[in-house]
Amino acid sequence: MTTTGTGPGGAAGSAGERPAAGKAASDPARNPDAADAEDAAPVIRTRGLTKRYRGGQLAVDSLDLTVPGGTVFGFLGPNGSGKTTTIRMLMGLISPTFGTAEVLGRPMPGDGRTVLPEVGALIEGPALYGFLDGRENLLCYDRADPTADPRTRGARVDAALERVGLSAASRKKAKAYSLGMKQRLGLAAALLRPRRLLVLDEPTNGLDPQGMREIRALVRELAAEGTTVFLSSHLLDEIEQVCTHAAVMARGRLVVQGTVADLAAGSRGRLAVTTPDPGDAARILAEHGLTGLSADGDRLTADAPPADVDLADLNAALVSGGVRVRFFGVERGSLEDAFVALTGEGFDVAG
């Protein structure tokens, strides 16, 4: 569903428990203003936000979420964790059972008519007229926006198509578009006018690797222009590459939120050993109390030892035990490590 005015989907609008402290890492792939985001007014704030469906299913439970302005904010969670339900409440598509949500400082869904023209959204895939071509679909979206100047409509549509790389396919019927092309067209609809907030639910779904890189570059470009981007994705690598901040959901509850750098740093990382003797190495490390041992060829990894364990002593124990050590060290924690530690779930976190 793409929301930009009242479009083909009929939706109105254009469209933690322990916050981590500190600044985002200095990374050219991230918004250079991320370090100042902690002081920015939040563009999204929820307090006790709860959604219980008929039949008693509790989809979102007492969510306290804060999205600072000027950030690229990643929203992560396993299947059924409540991510999409949260987004639908933020956009006014469904009402909460309890609690409050503010978007751009205004209550939702009550102030949707004021808020949604400043928000572009791509939720659960774009709503398109299959019998119209790509350009005609965007013209429909633009006509549905009462604030859009009809005199510049064509120029806006062409600029949006160019920005998402669909100019060459703009006269092709939407029903013939691939999934990735439909995602691009939905994103173009969300970008027909400048937005203060862009909400994207799995924006790279269906894209090939080059298309994914292009969308990531576009997200960074939008952030550099001052747009706050709220991004739900099942690709942890994508979140690490493009997001400055993130929140993790599990079973309808917020587990943690903070900068991506701090969330990754909060993971203990992994001890890595490269050796032609992985069996002996695993036995010796286990004897010294290490857990989470995993071997892949000549590479052995384990949970990082506690701070009071001397790595030099572990290395010496391996050598004295006849293990031929080619590499030994602790690799820094990743967002994936932090996610698994926080949720107990594996890498596939779509939903």
PLM-predicted stretches and their roles:
Residues I215-P305:
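ABC transporter nucleotide-binding domain
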Residues T2-A21, P306-G351:
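C-terminal coupling/interaction segments
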Residues N31-D39:
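Asp/Glu-rich intrinsically disordered low-complexity tracts
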Residues A40-T46, K51-A250, V256:
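ABC transporter nucleotide-binding domains
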Residues R47, L104, T274, S294-D296, ...:
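Solvent-exposed beta-strand sheet faces enriched in polar/charged residues
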